[in-house]
């Protein structure tokens, strides 16, 4: 004869079914609590916060860490759209603008670090092609690649849509890595210019 539990037995705290049901409910409740926390960790750092450190490589393979750059002086961190399937003309224009003002940045002991994000496949080659559209980068300006959006995700800047990579963004960091200024653009052409940065610093 098959043993059948009554409703009362199934709901008894010592019942195996009751214990299994309780464990399942606990697991679901735990997931609901943990998932929002994981999502919150990717929030974009704001003015006054400390910028998360990262290490990326130049297209030629030289490692560059944000902490090393900020230790040298005020650092302008610019996240480009990188390679969304083509070379972004707004990015070309923005980098050209900063290169033209490199002496103004150098006079204030500023470093500029561009981040070029995109899918890992041939990203270094795409970045080299991008730099061919520029004059040679001066000593106080560097460009690093962000394959598979490591830094982009760390800063909560991933523009997760077809033919998109990252929201164009600019941060100004002091020598301790604290954010003095930040701008996150939600369109391709809304960029921070070199003059914008220089005028912001003059106000401080």
Locations of the language-model features?
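N-terminal "domain-start" segment that seeds a small globular fold
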Residues: 40-68, 93, 97
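Structural micro-motif
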Residues: 138-141, 159-171
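Structural microenvironment flanking redox-active thiols in thiol-disulfide oxidoreductases
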Residues: 87-139, 150-152
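Bacterial N-terminal signal peptides
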Residues: 26-37
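Thiol-/selenol-based redox modules, centered on thioredoxin-like
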Residues: 165-204
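N-terminal secretory signal peptides that target proteins for export/translocation
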Residues: 1-22
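Short active-site neighborhood of thiol/selenol oxidoreductases, capturing the structured segment around
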Residues: 69-96
């Amino acid at each position: 004869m098959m043993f059948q539990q009554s409703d009362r037995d199934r709901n008894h705290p010592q019942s195996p079914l009751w214990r299994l049901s309780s464990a399942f409910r606990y697991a679901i409740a735990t997931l609901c609590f943990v998932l929002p926390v994981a999502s919150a960790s990717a929030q974009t750092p704001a003015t006054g916060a400390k910028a998360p450190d990262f290490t990326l490589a130049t297209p030629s393979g030289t490692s560059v860490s944000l902490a090393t750059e900020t230790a040298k002086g005020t650092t302008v961190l610019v996240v480009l759209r990188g390679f969304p399937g083509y070379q972004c003309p707004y990015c070309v224009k923005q980098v050209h603008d900063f290169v033209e003002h490199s002496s103004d940045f150098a006079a204030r002991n500023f470093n500029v670090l561009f981040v070029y994000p995109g899918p890992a496949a041939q990203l270094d080659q795409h970045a080299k092609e991008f730099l061919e559209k520029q004059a040679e980068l001066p000593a106080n300006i560097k460009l690093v690649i962000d394959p598979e959006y490591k830094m982009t995700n760390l800063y909560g800047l991933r523009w997760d849509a077809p033919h998109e990579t990252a929201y164009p963004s600019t941060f100004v960091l002091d020598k301790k890595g604290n954010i003095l200024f930040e701008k996150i653009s939600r369109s391709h052409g809304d960029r921070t210019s070199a003059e914008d940065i220089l005028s912001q610093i003059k106000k401080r």
